[in-house]
Amino acid sequence: DLTPKVQVYSRFPASAGTKNVLNCFAAGFHPPKISITLMKDGVPMEGAQYSDMSFNDDWSFQRLVYADFTPSSDAVYTCKVDHETLKEPQVYKWDPEF
């Protein structure tokens, strides 16, 4: 079994009040069953899209979840990932670098 490696990033350089896309990319995990949730201030974001699950040469899996959003400087954006290799769901914070 392989633990997911997770990255949270925006499609474009972040600026408060400007529309953007928040991505959460999980890769290198096995088995393929995984839960990935984009959240704003601890609440699941609306309109999240899920790419097709794909796999790498070593048969580990990867998946991208993304959502349109307009970053605000006082909101906290995170990605919660749950997988059987994790004792509990892990939360990864987006660092906007405003």
UniProtKB/Swiss-Prot annotation:
Pfam families on file: C1-set
Gene Ontology terms: biological process: antigen processing and presentation of peptide antigen via MHC class I; immune response
CDD domains documented for this protein: IgC1_beta2m
Compartments where located: Secreted
Disulfide bonds: C24-C79
Keywords for this protein: Disulfide bond, Immunity, Immunoglobulin domain, MHC I, Secreted
Entry GO terms, CC: extracellular region; MHC class I protein complex
Domain Ig-like C1-type: 4-92
Keyword Secreted attributed: yes
PANTHER family found in the cross-reference section: BETA-2-MICROGLOBULIN (PTHR19944:SF62), MHC CLASS II-RELATED (PTHR19944)
Self-association state and partner proteins as the record states: Heterodimer of an alpha chain and a beta chain. Beta-2-microglobulin is the beta-chain of major histocompatibility complex class I molecules.
Family per record: Belongs to the beta-2-microglobulin family.
Function: Component of the class I major histocompatibility complex (MHC). Involved in the presentation of peptide antigens to the immune system.
Protein name, as recorded: Beta-2-microglobulin
Originating species: Meleagris gallopavo
High-level lineage: Eukaryota, Metazoa, Chordata, Craniata, Vertebrata
